[in-house]
Amino acid sequence: MPGDRGALSSPAASSGSPSAAPSGIAACPPPPSPLARASPQASGPRRGASVPQKLAETLSSQYGLNVFVAGLLFLLAWAVHATGVGKSDLLCVLTALMLLQLLWMLWYVGRSYMQRRLIRPKDTHAGARWLRGSITLFAFITIVLGCLKVAYFIGFSECLSATEGVFPVTHAVHTLLQVYFLWGHAKDIIMSFKTLERFGVIHSVFTNLLLWANSVLNESKHQLNEHKERLITLGFGNITIVLDDHTPQCNCTPPALCSALSHGIYYLYPFNIEYQILASTMLYVLWKNIGRRVDSSRHQKMQCRFDGVLVGSVLGLTVLAATIAVVVVYMIHIGRSKSKSESALIMFYLYAITVLLLMGAAGLVGSWIYRVDEKSLDESKNPARKLDADLLVATASGSWLLSWGSILAIACAETRPPYTWYNLPYSVLVIVEKYVQNIFIIESVHLEPEGVPEDVRTLRVVTVCSGEAAALAASSLGSQGTAQDGSPAVNGNLHLQQRCEKEDQEADWEGATGTTRCLDFLQGGMKRRLLRNITAFLFLCNISLWIPPAFGCRPEYDNGLEEIVFGFEPWIIVVNLAMPFSIFYRMHAAAALFEVYCKI
């Protein structure tokens, strides 16, 4: 009956009928009225609900910064031999901070075990398995380092305080529990006891940063002493050189064993340094995730496949083998005589220039492929990904500082040794290569995975609604499409998609014939193989460039030009501040590139 048909169609008309939409455009439900938005029954979150949590975040971050600043002052006081501050005082402070973190982790693990049956939200991007595997490897070497320190303490027990034996034991226990904690809870999104947990997590972050700073200081003092000994051997009488010797004032039995332990400790410090900074970054992501609402979008599991990367792997392994050979020759020749030192520096600069040129070219090719491919970006909020990008740029600043210092020293020097003209292109390439590599990595981690469904991508482009209406339109389109295949809304949506694709094709045909040919060449498997080879090569090269500065091959110390221009003490301070960030950059870039490889 006509009357019945009109009665049935009136609700659809009041809610926005598809047939009432303009031709060719998907209909959108009307936006909610202001009265509905202001009603108490509205499902939106209250504005004042997040104020206490924002206050807790601010308070906890300020607490952590105060702990860190106070700890840094203790480290500085010990480093400059301040009156009344000895090594035992510093170790007591660090031990107390570790014990406090241990208590919090035990409480958190125990409470999580009691609530193990509850379903908790997880951040699938945080604490990747390969990342936890890396931190486990570094933690194992850190425990070995602690064992060597305990053996060293036993050898010199007559003149060392008890804190120097307690500290490595506490650190070993702290390392074991922290690795267990990160394996089990790095993905947690804490939704209860949020204020207390913020303080516990941020305390853990800055405790690890202080342990990192302590390791960096010990390793830097050792490297500086070796550099001063080389200068004494080479006869630099115009520089006041005082060795900062912390050797105990008593005999060790047997002496040969104690000497071997002392040298072994400093060779393991680079791994301990990487462990502490890696743990602090994982804990920082956990802190940022407290109270966070998880994105309900489907997470694509990354599967790493190692087929089809023969070229990149062979080139990378060749660079790695050459790096080990260069470091061995450098450490043997440097400081033996003036001619041998200059030849060692020239060898290192030639090696580094070659590697940096290859890495820069690989990064440019990878970025060019992304420009040609024009894939959409994943703009969802991700604390782990944002931290990775921020750390890449921040830690690259350490190398940039050293490189610009070398360039300025070359420009201002009155006399220039032969290796100066190798140092100049090396310094320029360090700046350019990290600039290019950062762009490649950051763009790679922000690209959408290959497995994103096509209908999801189409919906992002085709939907013409705004605000809350967009989500309602998406759901209504899905339900109408299943109910009746010939729905005007669906047909209009497809018509709009076809029109957009036609316009894009016309634009591409007018101005990008060459780009289309590149796209034809780089379709599917060819593009992925090329990107994987580039990423594998850059991954191995970053590990290779981590080795020389981590194990004492530091031309910034040994070429002497910067020390003459800036002065010995000022330049040494700059190197000691910038070098830890430069070393960490290479390992962090390698970790980010591994994630990129698994994503491609």
Curated annotation (Swiss-Prot):
Topology term for the membrane: Multi-pass membrane protein
UniProt KW Magnesium keyword: no
Cytoplasmic side: 1-56, 111-128, 187-194, 289-309, 369-386, 443-532, 594-600
Transmembrane segments: 57-78, 87-110, 129-151, 162-186, 195-221, 263-288, 310-332, 343-368, 387-411, 422-442, 533-551, 570-593
Source organism, top-level taxon: Eukaryota
Catalysed transformations (reactions): H(+)(in) = H(+)(out)
Region: Disordered, residue numbers: 1-50
Annotated InterPro entries: Otopetrin
BP-aspect Gene Ontology terms: biomineral tissue development; cellular response to insulin stimulus; detection of gravity; inner ear morphogenesis; negative regulation of type II interferon-mediated signaling pathway; proton transmembrane transport
Extracellular-side positions: 79-86, 152-161, 222-262, 333-342, 412-421, 552-569
Cellular component annotations (GO), alphabetically ordered: membrane; microvillus; plasma membrane
GO MF annotation, one: proton channel activity
UniProt subunit comment: Homodimer. Interacts with STAT1, independently of STAT1 phosphorylation status.
Family statement: Belongs to the otopetrin family.
Domain-level remarks: Residues involved in the gating by extracellular Zn (2+) and pH are located in the extracellular loops between transmembrane domain 5-6 and transmembrane domain 11-12.
Protein name: Proton channel OTOP1
Taxonomic source organism: Rattus norvegicus
Gene: Otop1
